[in-house]
Amino acid sequence: GKGRVWMTSRVRIEANTDACKAGSTNSSANYFPLNSSSRHASYFDPDTEEMTLIDTCYSTHHLQFASDADDTLWFSGDTQAIGWINTRLWDETGNELAAQGWCPTVIDTNGDGEITKPWNEPGQSPVAGRDTRLVGFAYGIIPNPRDGSVWITRTQPTPGQILRLDPGSNPPFT
């Protein structure tokens, strides 16, 4: 690591810009647009004594680094999606939109081994043969260094959930 202290911070008002919505250059925005985020990312660099704010399209709460070549920083804290920052890409480009990604939590309920749209949405009558999207406040998050998956806890719906997210080789599409 670079000795920075990463944290979550409020960077702006909740309404997301068009960069977080369909038509954006960000693949996550086109795959699963987000309209708002209440808390974002930041870090303090002790060497320069500077604070850097990073606007994220997803809300953040808890954060954890993965053991991967991109020094991926995973975030819980959104009810609709799980987010990440590719800190290697951030360091190379300084482009907050290009360095971030997110995806919804969708279960392969049709059993075909892939997550495909359209899926069953929360609160709607399920359609047979579709995968199912889950929502709820994502509280804790921990990457698994053995297989690259990410484990999250959800506080809602009661009594809560423990979910394993496999980002695949081309997130958010896999």
Predicted regions located by residue number:
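Surface-exposed loop and turn segments in beta-propeller and other repeat-based domains
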Residues: 1, 32-58, 87-134, 173-174
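Acidic/polar residues at beta-strand termini and the immediately following turn/coil
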Residues: 1, 43-45, 66-67, 86, ...
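Structural signature of eukaryotic scaffold interfaces centered on beta-propeller domains
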Residues: 1-2, 62-70, 125-147
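Conserved beta-propeller blade signature
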Residues: 4-8, 70-76, 149-153
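Short, conserved, GDST-rich strand-edge loop motifs in beta-rich repeat architectures
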Residues: 7-36, 79-105, 155-163
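Internal alpha-helical scaffold/solenoid segments in large eukaryotic proteins
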Residues: 48, 54-65, 71-73, 155-172
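Helix-coil boundary/capping segments in enzymes
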Residues: 57, 112, 135, 141, ...
